[in-house]
């Protein structure tokens, strides 16, 4: 052990090309340097030991944020200023949300082959548990432990979304989750609420239950503004359908990782959920939901075509941005269509309630991971950036470090901290109850403050079990989405769709059990 430690101490990381490093002993390094000097006429020496004059390059891949000011802050303020302060050249590439899984899969294959992946760190938007063997689980653990020491607990939602209890390893670090309330047109909802009576009555101030959405949705569809909940092979569909399943008291697995959706008593609950979604589609929606993309919620709602969507607050924020632009153009807030639209774009206080409770998910789950084959200087830079990014939630910390306004304000409260005390509840609510974005739009200044309740109702993908490699594959191969869509379209009966999906899910779980990454027995 002592000899091994001495060997490691004698080694140094050497950059051999852009993004490529090699670990050499001091003796090997000096030999290479001498050889390069002897062949000086052949060109410059390639092997260069890292010095302060030659900063580490840290390559990050992440999504194009649905609140554009966040990318402006991260790319033009946080990353360059953090890099300057820490002697790191930070290169950020932003791509569409749907592009990330394919890029990550390609890079994972390169890591497995011992090659440079192309990026050093990637931000995923669902728990990337299938990549556990290609990522630096020790680095992730070190980041999480340091953040716990600095700011306190890592919320259970994040723990279940990044930690594998079977291997006892962290396959990622979650810096944020994005609450997923129901957005609805308050003006249209009030009209419907006034019209419905008796057992069809719905609350005046928006839906509380899934049945409220079904009842009101029938009228909203007749008015030309149907419900817009995707039934396609994309992330938002996967999230809201699981929220509904969990609210019906069923799901893919139990806490131990056993597949349960077709096992009594869960089988009947799953069938009931399938029948409900079929009725919800037929009575309240339109065929376009079968071609939904991650942008459709925003596009269809903001165009005025749909009246209800399950979405992060980016819908409300975009409506407010359009309203603020109208006010800057000189429009009267009390007459401006854009301002009125923003004022009538509301969110529910909680996830809709089903027979078993009000259980929601997150719209996206922000999880960063570092590839396992990154050299020590890059690894250390990635760890420090993640720690400082989480600490920047606090606007006072961000201002002191030189990258204001910080993560929470830059995202306009879209990114909610998984280290809950990175920004105190008092500071979160101070922002949300006197919201500068809402005020600039002529909107009610505290309208989005209810998003704080998401800590009480947001659940992880795969609840009540962990977000395992099997859950990751089931989610990203859209097995649940297809099951519900085939029933809604009348292609399969609920029983046929459930049996087919359960068989697929069991094969996925068995594959990952055989690799030692998933628990459970059936």
Positions of predicted regions on the chain:
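N-terminal secretory signal peptides
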Residues: 1-24, 28
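N-terminal export signals
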Residues: 20-22, 28-48
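Extracytoplasmic/periplasmic solute-binding protein
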Residues: 42, 47, 166-175, 180, ...
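Early extracytoplasmic/lumenal segment of secretory-pathway proteins
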Residues: 55-59, 64-128, 295, 299
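Hinge/lid segment of periplasmic solute-binding proteins
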Residues: 123-181, 240-244, 333-352, 520-522
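Short, solvent-exposed loop/beta-turn-alpha elements that line the ligand-binding surface or hinge
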Residues: 141-154, 203-206, 250-272, 332-341, ...
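Glycine-centered hinge/linker elements that transmit conformational signals in sensory
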Residues: 212-220, 256-294, 336, 345-347, ...
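C-terminal lobe and pocket-closing loops
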Residues: 314-325, 332-340, 355-479, 516-522
């Amino acid at each position: 052990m002592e000899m091994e430690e001495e060997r490691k101490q004698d080694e140094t990381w050497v950059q051999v090309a852009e993004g490529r490093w090699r670990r050499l002993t001091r003796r090997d390094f000096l030999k290479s340097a001498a050889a390069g000097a002897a062949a000086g006429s052949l060109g410059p020496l390639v092997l260069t030991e890292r010095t302060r004059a030659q900063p580490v390059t840290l390559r990050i891949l992440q999504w194009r944020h649905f609140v554009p000011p966040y990318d402006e802050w991260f790319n033009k303020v946080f990353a360059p200023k953090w890099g300057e302060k820490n002697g790191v050249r930070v290169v950020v590439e932003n791509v569409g949300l749907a592009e990330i899984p394919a890029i990550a899969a390609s890079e994972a294959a390169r890591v497995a082959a011992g090659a440079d992946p192309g990026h050093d760190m990637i931000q995923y938007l669902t728990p990337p548990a299938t990549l556990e063997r290609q990522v630096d689980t020790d680095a992730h653990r070190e980041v999480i432990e340091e953040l716990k020491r600095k700011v306190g607990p890592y919320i259970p939602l994040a723990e279940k979304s990044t930690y594998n209890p079977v291997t006892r390893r962290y396959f990622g670090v979650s810096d944020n989750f994005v609450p997923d309330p129901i957005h609805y047109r308050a003006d249209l909802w009030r009209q419907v609420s006034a019209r419905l009576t008796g057992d069809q009555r719905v609350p005046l101030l928006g839906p509380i239950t899934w049945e409220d959405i079904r009842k009101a949705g029938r009228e909203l569809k007749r008015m030309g503004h149907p419900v817009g909940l995707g039934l396609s092979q994309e992330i938002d569909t996967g999230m809201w359908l699981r929220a509904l399943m969990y609210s019906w008291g069923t799901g893919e697995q139990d806490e131990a990782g056993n597949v349960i959706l077709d096992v009594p008593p869960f089988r009947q609950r799953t069938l009931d959920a399938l029948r409900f979604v079929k009725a919800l589609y037929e009575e309240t929606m339109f065929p376009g939901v079968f071609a939904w993309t991650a942008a459709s919620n925003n596009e269809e709602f903001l165009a005025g075509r749909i009246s209800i969507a399950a979405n992060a607050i980016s819908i409300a924020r975009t409506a407010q941005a359009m309203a603020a632009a109208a006010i800057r153009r000189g429009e009267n807030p009390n007459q401006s269509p854009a301002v009125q639209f923003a004022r009538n774009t509301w969110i529910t206080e909680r996830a809709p309630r089903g027979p078993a409770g009000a259980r929601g998910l997150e719209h996206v789950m922000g999880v960063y991971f570092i590839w396992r084959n990154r050299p020590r200087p890059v690894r250390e830079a990635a760890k420090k950036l993640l720690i400082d990014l989480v600490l920047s939630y606090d606007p006072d910390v961000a201002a002191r470090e030189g990258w204001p306004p910080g993560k929470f304000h830059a995202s306009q409260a879209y990114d909610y901290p998984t280290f809950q005390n990175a920004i105190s509840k008092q500071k979160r609510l101070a922002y949300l109850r006197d919201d500068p974005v809402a005020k600039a739009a002529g909107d009610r200044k505290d309208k989005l403050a209810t998003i704080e309740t998401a800590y009480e109702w947001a659940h992880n993908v795969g609840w009540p079990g962990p977000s395992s490699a099997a859950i990751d594959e089931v989610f990203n191969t859209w097995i649940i989405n297809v099951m519900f869509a085939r029933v809604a379209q009348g292609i399969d009966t609920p029983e046929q769709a459930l049996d087919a999906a359960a068989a697929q899910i069991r094969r996925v779980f068995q594959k990952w059990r055989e690799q030692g990454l998933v628990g459970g027995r059936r």
